Amino acid sequence: MMSLRLFSILLATVVSGAWGWGYYGCNEELVGPLYARSLGASSYYGLFTTARFARLHGISGWSPRIGDPNPWLQIDLMKKHRIRAVATQGAFNSWDWVTRYMLLYGDRVDSWTPFYQKGHNATFFGNVNDSAVVRHDLHYHFTARYIRIVPLAWNPRGKIGLRLGIYGCPYTSSILYFDGDDAISYRFQRGASQSLWDVFAFSFKTEEKDGLLLHTEGSQGDYVTLELQGAHLLLHMSLGSSPIQPRPGHTTVSLGGVLNDLSWHYVRVDRYGRDANFTLDGYAHHFVLNGDFERLNLENEIFIGGLVGAARKNLAYRHNFRGCIENVIYNRINIAEMAVMRHSRITFEGNVAFRCLDPVPHPINFGGPHNFVQVPGFPRRGRLAVSFRFRTWDLTGLLLFSHLGDGLGHVELMLSEGQVNVSIAQTGRKKLQFAAGYRLNDGFWHEVNFVAQENHAVISIDDVEGAEVRVSYPLLIRTGTSYFFGGCPKPASRWGCHSNQTAFHGCMELLKVDGQLVNLTLVEFRKLGYFAEVLFDTCGITDRCSPNMCEHDGRCYQSWDDFICYCELTGYKGVTCHEPLYKESCEAYRLSGKYSGNYTIDPDGSGPLKPFVVYCDIRENRAWTVVRHDRLWTTRVTGSSMDRPFLGAIQYWNASWEEVSALANASQHCEQWIEFSCYNSRLLNTAGGYPYSFWIGRNEEQHFYWGGSQPGIQRCACGLDQSCVDPALHCNCDADQPQWRTDKGLLTFVDHLPVTQVVVGDTNRSNSEAQFFLRPLRCYGDRNSWNTISFHTGAALRFPPIRANHSLDVSFYFRTSAPSGVFLENMGGPFCRWRRPYVRVELNTSRDVVFAFDIGNGDENLTVHSDDFEFNDDEWHLVRAEINVKQARLRVDHRPWVLRPMPLQTYIWLVYDQPLYVGSAELKRRPFVGCLRAMRLNGVTLNLEGRANASEGTFPNCTGHCTHPRFPCFHGGRCVERYSYYTCDCDLTAFDGPYCNHDIGGFFETGTWMRYNLQSALRSAAREFSHMLSRPVPGYEPGYVPGYDTPGYVPGYHGPGYRLPEYPRPGRPVPGYRGPVYNVTGEEVSFSFSTNSAPAVLLYVSSFVRDYMAVLIKEDGTLQLRYQLGTSPYVYQLTTRPVTDGQPHSVNITRVYRNLFIQVDYFPLTEQKFSLLVDSQLDSPKALYLGRVMETGVIDPEIQRYNTPGFSGCLSGVRFNNVAPLKTHFRTPRPMTAELAEAMRVQGELSESNCGAMPRLVSEVPPELDPWYLPPDFPYYHDDGWIAILLGFLVAFLLLGLVGMLVLFYLQNHRYKGSYHTNEPKATHDSHPGGKAPLPPSGPAQAPAPTPAPTQLPTPAPAPAPAPASGPGPRDQNLPQILEESRSE
C-alpha cells in the first residue's frame, strides 16, 4: 500500500510537472545562439580573449586581464529561463582553465544570488585541462535572466581561461507583488472540492520574516496553510477531524531558514492520501499526515498573499505577505496567470502589482580570510557618524575601524559574543569600551547607528526605542581620512589599520559615513576607495542548520562557513551526534565489570531509536535486562464484549514499544510472565474460533496462545500437559465456571515480545469478571554479536543498498588467513560518465585495512597500517568505519583513529541504487575468504547467517574447528562450532567433561537397584496397535540408530571426530533423557563396572511381552549375555575368565537385526548371528534395571537365579540406545519434573562414582583445561656442569676427526692429477653424428693418469667420459701455447 502511494505521488509529480514546474526535456544549450552583446566580462586579456569567445567548443576563450581583483563572466539570456545545468571548458589550446568557480544568477544586473549545491556549498569544481567539458547537473532548477561566473581558482601554470555552456529552456513567468495589505483569492469552478491527491507549487522572494503565503480550508476541519515565521517556511495541513476519530489531523512541517534574503525560493507540496512531499529549493521532505482521513475537502476559495473578506477572522493573527509570488500552481491551474489576466474567478484585495517592486540595497558579501572595504571620509570634523546594516552567523568579527585625525587615537566597532562592542582609544587617556545589542548573530539584518563627538558617544541597534546606549566621557573627536569595514588589510603598517580582531564574515549594506550614503557602485569599479575578497550586489548567507545535520535532536549552531553540533542531553556524541553514548545491553555492562542497578541502554546503537533506562540484574554468568511497565499490578475488567473489548495498553517505563522491541530483537532470550484469572469468563473457547481474549505483541500482531504454551497453537499451558479443569478444553478459563480459575505461564518466543496490549472480551455477563497481571520483560544475551558467516570459495552476499542519508557507520569483526579481500562494497549511480559514488572497506594487504569512498570529491581512502603484526593471523579483529559531513575515520581493534576532515560545506547523501556486497566487491571481484560477524550499519545488524548458502560457498558460523579438532569429542559427543573455539555436546552420551571423556557412575550397595521406565503400558498398547496396522520399513522405526546400515560402520565404536546427527529439540534437554523407547530392531548398550561379588544382574531390559535382554555375572565370576526375542532365549558367554577382581571392565554390545557385535575390555571385536527362527525385534521395551531385577510378572528362571542377593559394586557410563539412566539421575537439576520422577526410581544407597576408571586420553587434555593438573614436583639439582663440558669436548673431537678423514680422502683421490700441456686438438661435437665413437688419433697418445686406489667411502656417480682427443684442427693450430707446471700434491 505504501509503495502504491509513493508511486501515485511520483505520477502526480510527473503529470503536474508540465504545468509550469517540471519542464521535462528542458536541456537546450542557451549560450551558443546568443549575440555577442549578451556576453560581458569584468575585463579581458587580449583582442581574442574577450567575452564573445566564451562559448562552449569555441576557437578561443575568455581570459581577464592580469591583476583583475574581481574577475567575472556574465551572460544575458535576454529573457527569463529555467536553468538546469552548467558546463565549462578551458581556453582552446592553452594552459588556461578555471579549477573552481562560483555561479551567480538574478533577474537584474545589480542583484545577484549565489547558487548553493547540496550542503550549502557555493563552489563548483571546474576543469583539469583545456579541452574536457565538465558539466554539473543542478540538484534543482532555478529561473534567471542573468548568469555570472566568478572564478575562484585556476591552473597555477597558466591563467584564467573559460568557455561556458548553460542548459535550460525558456520560462513563462506570472508575478504577483504584495505590499503587506494586498491579497487575492481563487474560487473553484464547481464550488467545494474533494480530492485524493493535490499539488501546490509557487516561487516567492521577500525581505520580511513573517507573512501568509497561501491558505485554503474546508467546513469539515480540512485546511492547507503555507506561511513564513521567523524566515522559516511552515506548512500546516489537516485532512479533517471528527469526534469519533481518536487521532487529531493537524500536521506541521518546517523547512528552510533566512528565507528573507530577496532571492527566489521554489516551493512545492505533493500529496496522495496521507503521504506527502514538502519541497523547498530542491530539498524534499517526506512525511505522513496525522489523522485517519485521506481526502482533502475544501470550500470554494484559495487565498494568496493574505486573507480576503470574512476569512480574516479565522486567521486574524497572521501577517499578510510582503514580496513577490510567481506562478502559483494548484492541480494544473496557474492561479497567478489567471490573476494577471484578471479572470473572473479571481478576487483582489488592495492594489496587487504584476511585477516585482522590491528594493535593491546593493549588499556586499564578506567571505574571505582578509576581506575589507575601505572608503574615504571627511577629515578633521568634530562629529563622527557611521551607520550600516549587517547580517551574520559569526559571534565575532571586526565591523568598523577608523583612525582619528591629528593622531588622537582610533575607533573600533566589533562583534563579540553576538553584541556590538565599541572601543575608543585616545592618546594619553583610558580606553573607552561599551556594548549594545543582544544575539545579533541570528542571520537577520540589523541596523547600527554610531555617533561620537566631544564628551559623549551614542550607539543604537535596529532603531529600537529605548535601546540606544549613551556614554558620557571626556572625548576629543577629529574624524580621519579612511573607514575600514569588515576587516583590516595586510600589512597593517601600510594601510594604518591596526586591529587584533578577526575579519567579519557576513553581509553589509547601506553604508553611511559622516551622514553620506556610500556609492558602492563606484567602489566596485575602483573609482572610490578600495576593497579585497568581497562580492558586490550579493549576499551569500545561508542557513547551514536547515536541514539539520545534527542527528538525534542535537542542537545546531552555525557560523559563516560551518556548523557545530551540541549533543548534550541527547545520549549521543561525536561531531554530528551520531555515536551512541551508552551500551547496547546489560550484558555489555556486565562484561565491563558493572554491578546490578539502573543503567541507560541503546539497543540500536546509532540508529534512530532513543536510549532508555532499565534495571540490570547482573549475575556471574549473565545479565538480565528488566523493563518495567504500568501493568505490574492486577487489572480488573468487567463489562467488555467481543464487539467492544477492553484494550489494556502496556506503557513501558522510559521507553516506547519500538525501543523495547529493539531490545528484545537483539537479545538471545526474553521472557514475560502473563497471568489471566477469570470468574465466569471465557478465554479462547469460541464457536467461530476467534478468541474472546488475546494479547498483542511486536508489530501490533495478535497472538492467541498464552503463558506456558507455544506459538502457532491456540492453547494455554494446561492444554499442553492435559491438566486443564475440563480435559476437552485447552484453558482453565474456558470451563466458564462461576469460580476463579487461572491460566498463567511464561511467554518466551522472542520475536513476539514485548506484550504491548491485552484485549479482554467476555466480561459483560452477570457476575462475570476477568483479571490479568503482567510481569516485567526480562531478557539476556546478545544474538547480534555472534551473527557469523564464513566465506570459503570467494562467494558474496547481496543485501539491499545502503540508505544512510548523511551519516554512515560500519562495524564488524573479521578473521582470516588470506592476505587481502573486500569486506563490503556499495556502488551508486554515476556522477558522470567515468565516476561512480561508492563506499568500500577492505583488507588491502596483510597489514593494511582500508576505508575507501567517493562522495563526489574524488577517490579518498583511510588506511590503518600495522607494523607489529599481520591482520591475517586467523584471530578476530574489530573494524569501525564512519563517514559524515564533518569527517571520515577508521579504526581497527584498539589502535588510534585515522581521521580525515571533510572540506567545509561538504554534502553527503549516502543513498545508493546498487546492492550492498558483503564478502567481495561488485560482481564478486576481490573476494574475501574468512569469517565475518556482528556486521552493523548505522546500528542495524545484517543477518549474515540467514543469507548463508552452502552451494555458493558461504556457511553459518565460523566453521573449521570440528573438521580437524585438536581434541576430538569421544563416546558419540557432538562437536559444536563456537567461532573462535569449539565445544563438545555430551547430551547424547553417558559421559560429561570438556570432551565427553569423564565417566558418570554410581556405587551400588548390596540390595540397591535402579529402575528406568522406557514407556508406559497405555502408550505401549497404542503403539503396538498402530504397529500392527502399519509396520514400518526396516531401518526407519523409532529407536533405530542411524548409521548401522552405512558401509564401513563399526558398531559400538565412536572414535575421534565421531559426530551424531543433530536432532531438533526446543531448549536444552535433561541430560541423558530422551523420552520413551518403542519397538526397536537394534540396541546399543555400553557400560563399565567393577565388583568383587557374584552372582549378580548388571543390566536388564524388560518388556510388556516376554522379550528381554540381560547382562549378568554367573557364580564362577564370568560374564554372560542373555537375549529373548520371541520364543526361546539366546545365551552368549562374554568372558571365560572371572571379572570379579575389583578392576574396571567395559562392555559394549550392539545388535542390528540378527547381527550381534560384542567387545569386552580390550579384547577383539566379535560378531555373532542369531538364528533365522529368532525374531529381529525387541517388542515393547518396558523398563531398564540396574543392580537387580524387581519386575512383576513372569521372569526367566535363570534371571531369578542370579538376581539374589543383588549387585554390589560400581556401574558407570551406562547407556541403552539413547537413554543414560545414571547421567539422568546425577546430572538432572532438582526438583525433577513429574514425568521424569515417575520414570526413574532408586532403591537403596546409590552414590556417585567413576568406578576407578581413568578418563579417556587424559594425557591429551591440555593442562590449562584440566582442573586436576599439577606441575611436576621433582627435586632438581644442578650437578651436571662437568658432564656437559666433557660431552662438549667429546662431540668436538668427533667432528674434527670426521673433517680430517674427508681431507685425507680428497688428497688421495687427486694425488696424480694436475695441469699439463697437450698438442691434441679439441673434440668437436658436430663431427660425429649419430653418437658414433671417433677414430683413434694418428699421433702418439698421452699416457693415461694412474687410477687411485679404491676407498671404503661411497663415491658419487662418475661423470660421462670425454671423447678421445682428435688431431689438431685448423682452428687450434694458431692458438698460443700455454705451458703450466704440474702442481705438487
Curated annotation (Swiss-Prot):
Residues 1334-1367 have a biased composition (Pro residues). It holds the Pfam family F5_F8_type_C. Residues 1319-1329 have a biased composition (Basic and acidic residues). This is Contactin-associated protein 1. A motif (SH3-binding) lies at residues 1334-1370. Belongs to the neurexin family. Gene3D superfamilies: 2.60.120.1000, 2.60.120.200, Galactose-binding domain-like (2.60.120.260), Laminin (2.10.25.10). Disruption phenotype: Mutant mice exhibit tremor, ataxia, and significant motor paresis. Normal paranodal junctions fail to form, and the organization of the paranodal loops is disrupted. Contactin is undetectable in the paranodes, and potassium channels are displaced from the juxtaparanodal into the paranodal domains. Also results in a severe decrease in peripheral nerve conduction velocity. Double mutants CNTNAP1 and CNTNAP2 have wider Ranvier nodes compared to wild-type littermates. One of its GO terms (cellular component) is plasma membrane. Residues 204-356, 390-539, 814-958, 1089-1251 form the Laminin G-like domain. Residues 1306-1385 are cytoplasmic. GO terms for molecular function: SH3 domain binding. PROSITE patterns: EGF_3 (PS50026), FA58C_1 (PS01285), FA58C_2 (PS01286), FA58C_3 (PS50022), FIBRINOGEN_C_2 (PS51406), LAM_G_DOMAIN (PS50025). One of its GO terms (biological process) is neuronal action potential propagation.
